Amino acid sequence: MRQILFAAGIALAVSILLTPVLIKAFSRQGFGQEIRVEGPASHQSKRGTPTMGGVAILAGLWAGYWGSHLIGIGYDADGPSASGLLVLGLTTALGGVGFLDDFIKIRKQRNLGLNKTAKLVGQLIAAVAFGILALQFRGANDLTPGSEHLSYVRDIATVTMGSVVFVAFCYLLVSAWSNAVNLTDGLDGLAAGSMSLVLGAYVIITFWQYRNACETSPGKGCYDVRDPLDLALICAAGAGACIGFLWWNAAPAKIFMGDTGSLALGGMLAGLSITTRTELLMVVIGALFVAEAASVVIQVAVFRSSRRRVFRMAPFHHHFELAGWAETTVIIRFWLLAAIASAIGLALFYSEYLAAIGG
C-alpha cells in the first residue's frame, strides 16, 4: 500500500510542478493549439493555448512508477514487472505517436497533424509489439501478462482466441481506446478528470487482485493475474499525474494535453484491460469514453445514409454546448457520469467476486 501512495504522490508532484514550466516554454516557442473552424464559437478564444501537455502526464507517470520502486528497495519490495513495463511501454509509445501528431499541427498551423494512415500505422506497431510480448514472460503459475482468453472480470474459459487473433484483438483495443480518449479531450479538463476517476477505480481493482492472487492466496475467487501490485503502481501513478495536470488544465485551461496525452492515456486503458483480465469490464468503467466514441460513429453512419444528423455536433459533448449548456456544466456533469460508471464497474467487479466465493 505504501508503494501505491508513493507512486501517486510522486506522479502528482512532478506533474503539477512540471506543467507550468511547460506552459511557459511552449508559449515562448509558439506551441499553441489550433481550433476547429466548425466547432463551437466559444472555443475560438482558446486558439493559441499551449498544447502537448501530455508530456507532463507521461513524466509524472514515469517518475511515480520508478520513484515508488526506488523507495521500495528500502523495504525489499518487489521490483518492476513484465506486466507493468509492458503497460508503461505501450502508454509511452502511443504518447510518442501523439507527440508527432501535435508537433505537425503546430508546425503547419492547422488542426490536422498525422494523416489517418500514419496514425493507424503507429498504433498498429505499438499494439502488435505489446500483443506479442504480452504472451511471453511466464511467471508464477505459468501466467503471462496477457491471455488468449477473452475476459470480463477474469478469463472466460469458454472463449479462446489463439495467439494471432489475440494480437489482432490487442490492436482493436489499442485503436479503440486511444481514439475514444482522444475524442473525449475536447473540453477543458474533461479527459484528465475522467481518466483520474477511471484509474482510481483500477487502483482498487488491481490492489484487490493483489490481495486475492491465486499465487499467494489460492482458493475460491482468487485471481490469475500476473503482477497485480505493479499494475496498481501504474494506475496510481497515472491517476496522480492526471490530477496534477488537471490543476492547470481545468477550465479555463492554461494548457491542453493534446494527442500526446490522450493517445497515451487511451493506450494505458487498453493495456490495463488486457493485463488485469478485465477487457469487458473496462467498457463499463470507461463508459464515458465509449459513449463519446459511439456518438461520432453514430453521427457519421446516419449522416452518410440519410444526410441527417443525430447530434448538433459530435463528439456529443459539443452537442450539449450548442444546446446552450455552459462548458463547465458539461464538464462537471460528464465527470459525474464517469464517476457513476466507475462505481458501477467496481460494484460489478465485487459482486462477481462474491459470487465466485459463494457469498
Swiss-Prot record:
Pathway assignment reads: Cell wall biogenesis; peptidoglycan biosynthesis
The chemistry this enzyme catalyses reads: UDP-N-acetyl-alpha-D-muramoyl-L-alanyl-gamma-D-glutamyl-meso-2,6-diaminopimeloyl-D-alanyl-D-alanine + di-trans,octa-cis-undecaprenyl phosphate = di-trans,octa-cis-undecaprenyl diphospho-N-acetyl-alpha-D-muramoyl-L-alanyl-D-glutamyl-meso-2,6-diaminopimeloyl-D-alanyl-D-alanine + UMP
One molecular function GO term is: UDP-N-acetylmuramoyl-L-alanyl-D-glutamyl-meso-2,6-diaminopimelyl-D-alanyl-D-alanine:undecaprenyl-phosphate transferase activity
Superkingdom: Bacteria
InterPro entries for this protein: Glycosyl_transferase_4, PNAcMuramoyl-5peptid_Trfase, PNAcMuramoyl-5peptid_Trfase_CS
The EC number of this protein is 2.7.8.13
> What are the UniProt keywords, alphabetically?
Cell cycle, Cell division, Cell membrane, Cell shape, Cell wall biogenesis/degradation, Magnesium, Membrane, Metal-binding, Peptidoglycan synthesis, Transferase, Transmembrane, Transmembrane helix
State the NCBIfam families in the record. mraY
Q: What is this protein called?
A: Phospho-N-acetylmuramoyl-pentapeptide-transferase
- Is Membrane there in the keyword field? yes
Record-linked HAMAP family: MraY
Q: Which residues cross the membrane?
A: 3-23, 53-73, 84-104, 117-137, 156-176, 187-207, 231-251, 255-275, 283-303, 330-350
Q: Signal sequence span per UniProt?
A: none
Cofactor dependence is on:
Mg(2+)
Q: State the Gene Ontology BP annotations.
A: cell division; cell wall organization; peptidoglycan biosynthetic process; regulation of cell shape
Q: What is its main location?
A: membrane
A single GO cellular-component term on record:
plasma membrane
UniProt keyword annotation of Translocase present = no
Q: Which family does it belong to?
A: Belongs to the glycosyltransferase 4 family. MraY subfamily.
Location(s) in or outside the cell = Cell membrane
Q: How does it sit in the membrane?
A: Multi-pass membrane protein
Functional note? Catalyzes the initial step of the lipid cycle reactions in the biosynthesis of the cell wall peptidoglycan: transfers peptidoglycan precursor phospho-MurNAc-pentapeptide from UDP-MurNAc-pentapeptide onto the lipid carrier undecaprenyl phosphate, yielding undecaprenyl-pyrophosphoryl-MurNAc-pentapeptide, known as lipid I.
- Stored CDD domains: GT_MraY
